[in-house]
Amino acid sequence: MNSRIFPAAMSAPYAPLQPAVVVHDEQGRLYSAAYGDVYHSRDDAAGQAEHVFLRGNGLPQRWRGRARFTVCETGFGMGLNFLTLWQAWRDDPARPRRLHMLSLEGHPFAREDLLAVLRAHAPAGLQALATQLAAQWPPLLPGLHRLEFEGGALTLTLGFGAAQQLAPRLTARVDAYFLDGFAPRGNPAMWDPHMLQALARLAAPDATLASWCSAGQVRQALQQAGFAVRRAPGFGGKWHMTLGQRLPGVATPDDAPDDDGAPVLVVGAGLAGAAVAHALALRGRAVTVLDAARLAGLASHAGHAAAALTPVIARDDNPRARLSRAGSQRAWLRWRDLPAPAAPRRCGTVQLERDAGRAAALAQTLQILQFPADWVRMVDRDQAGALAGLPVARGGVFFADGMLVRPGALIDALLAGEGISTIAAQAARLRRHGAQWQVLDAQGRQVAQAPVVVLANAADAPRLLADSGLLEPLPRLARMHALAGEVTLLPAEALSGGPRCVVGGEGYLLPAVDGWCVAGSTYVHGAAQALTGAEGQRVNLDKAAGLLGQAPAAFASLQPGSLPGWAGWRAVLPGRLPAAGPLAHAPGLWLAAGYASRGLSWAALMGDVIAARLCGEPGPLETDLLAQIAPR
């Protein structure tokens, strides 16, 4: 099991994603005007996928008897290689338990276009799989997108953006390469030696490659990247294709998976801990969760009726914006199938701007980013009010993926997963004993032990590490502080039933849950306790009033101090980004903490970041983002 800390990568200038356009040539083949080339063979596209990429990599024979197998592809296109691979995996009774595909695509199709081209070009035997692929197809946003099929046994990690920028930022242990993409004459960047070397660094010791392209400069670049290459008979009208085998002695990825499937101990039963436990349990790991709140007969987020999950955007698409975008996508895909009331409600968020100047700057930001309008768009005051179902003070932006979440119900559902057990205990100290980490209580008694321990205990994590003599190498974590805050429950009838979507800005107002609308929130520095009270309710009522264009008369009659609410703590780190990953100085210890006010945005993503690295999967985040969140 590896605890490598990823170095920060230099940020490339932001370039908006340019979707593919559906064009056919005179022979009815799908064609790219940008690259002057067709998407598939003149003969049989699925036949080429099987001949070149499956047989060329010795599949399905090479994957038999393995626990996992990972494929890396350049040029996803319309996805026929993926669908052919998926079908071959389904048809093989000796298939690996888990199959992962990592595929890069600079110009992805929109969902409707993808479905249309697959309906037109995929064989009848792949149509059912094509429908499943289109159903999960992500919005056209730059970065990595993780899709799951077959109950999570098959994953597809899509990298949307320039391959030469994404390739150096991938984490995986690749067993087979499908080198596809348009011809080098029209798309030289896809076959650039530096790009191929960036992919080759991911190769497992016995990795193979196959490509329809047999150009001499491509074969030479692959040889320089550490592969023994040869030509083989091509498919259809092509005389040759290229096959390759990783040369012995060449450096291989140091992200070796934790193959023994050892149990994992998670310290903390809040949102961070529940999400880590859930992600690991979905992969078949046995997980024990230590829940300190249960010692006092409490439940995490008890009384917290509802919270919002809204992405953020930035003109330079900075790490916080990228992580937020990835986190909101991951949360929806991970939680949408949970039973009610745990499943999020995708109601959207109207985020109001403070003034006309900020609104103009935001409009310019959206023009630069060129994100899909069905993901985020500008709205004026009337449009915002129509979306919210009540008058609002200003216009702003509408995030279609904004969600309403019931935190307590979500945590309960995550911890109820098969393979997860919970112990009511407080972790006072950690102690290394052989290959195990032992958790001790305040009396020095062992509470639990495991070879892998994930600290997801929010602002108590620095204290636990300090008392265990493990905090000194983590100066950023040592600066974590707890910030109190409260939300207030407003009767929905005082708000004409409440908004239909999340309304945010200077504060937020949420749609009704069980007759109450949550308004928030306060930030109390230096508090000894997290409490509700008249002053906090006054702040939240003022924030709610500032969001509303014309508050109903019943709202004006609400009195601070007379309303129910909930108070809690935020664990805040410098930079307000979370910390998730292994502790380099303490092998076997991992951290998932510092989620501040964005626990819902970070939880599912950080859980999958940790679980993917423990289980030898392609990473769901780029290495420059992993460096930003690495515990330090």
Curated annotation (Swiss-Prot):
This protein's major location comes to cytoplasm
Signal sequence region: none
Q: Report the Gene3D superfamilies cross-referenced here.
A: D-Amino Acid Oxidase, subunit A, domain 2 (3.30.9.10), FAD/NAD(P)-binding domain (3.50.50.60), Vaccinia Virus protein VP39 (3.40.50.150)
One Gene Ontology MF term:
tRNA (5-methylaminomethyl-2-thiouridylate)(34)-methyltransferase activity
InterPro entries associated with the record: FAD-dep_OxRdtase, FAD/NAD-bd_sf, MnmC-like_methylTransf, SAM-dependent_MTases_sf, tRNA_MAMT_biosynth_bifunc_MnmC, tRNA_MNMC2, tRNA_S-uridine_synth_MnmC_C
Location within or outside the cell: Cytoplasm
Protein's GO biological process = methylation; tRNA wobble base modification
Q: Which keywords accompany this UniProt record?
A: Cytoplasm, FAD, Flavoprotein, Methyltransferase, Multifunctional enzyme, Oxidoreductase, S-adenosyl-L-methionine, Transferase, tRNA processing
Recorded GO CC terms: cytoplasm
Give the residue ranges for region: tRNA (mnm(5)s(2)U34)-methyltransferase. 1-247
User: Looking at the record, which segments are called FAD-dependent cmnm(5)s(2)U34 oxidoreductase?
Assistant: 267-632
Q: Which reaction does it catalyse?
A: 5-aminomethyl-2-thiouridine(34) in tRNA + S-adenosyl-L-methionine = 5-methylaminomethyl-2-thiouridine(34) in tRNA + S-adenosyl-L-homocysteine + H(+)
A Pfam family of the record is DAO
Give its E.C. classification number.
2.1.1.61, 1.5.-.-
Q: What is the required cofactor set for this protein?
A: FAD
For this protein, the record's SUPFAM superfamilies field holds: FAD/NAD(P)-binding domain (SSF51905)
The protein's superkingdom reads Bacteria
- What's this protein's family per the entry? In the N-terminal section; belongs to the methyltransferase superfamily. tRNA (mnm(5)s(2)U34)-methyltransferase family.
Its annotated function is as follows: Catalyzes the last two steps in the biosynthesis of 5-methylaminomethyl-2-thiouridine (mnm(5)s(2)U) at the wobble position (U34) in tRNA. Catalyzes the FAD-dependent demodification of cmnm(5)s(2)U34 to nm(5)s(2)U34, followed by the transfer of a methyl group from S-adenosyl-L-methionine to nm(5)s(2)U34, to form mnm(5)s(2)U34.
This protein is called what? tRNA 5-methylaminomethyl-2-thiouridine biosynthesis bifunctional protein MnmC
> Which organism was this protein described from?
Bordetella bronchiseptica (strain ATCC BAA-588 / NCTC 13252 / RB50) (Alcaligenes bronchisepticus)
Gene behind this chain? mnmC
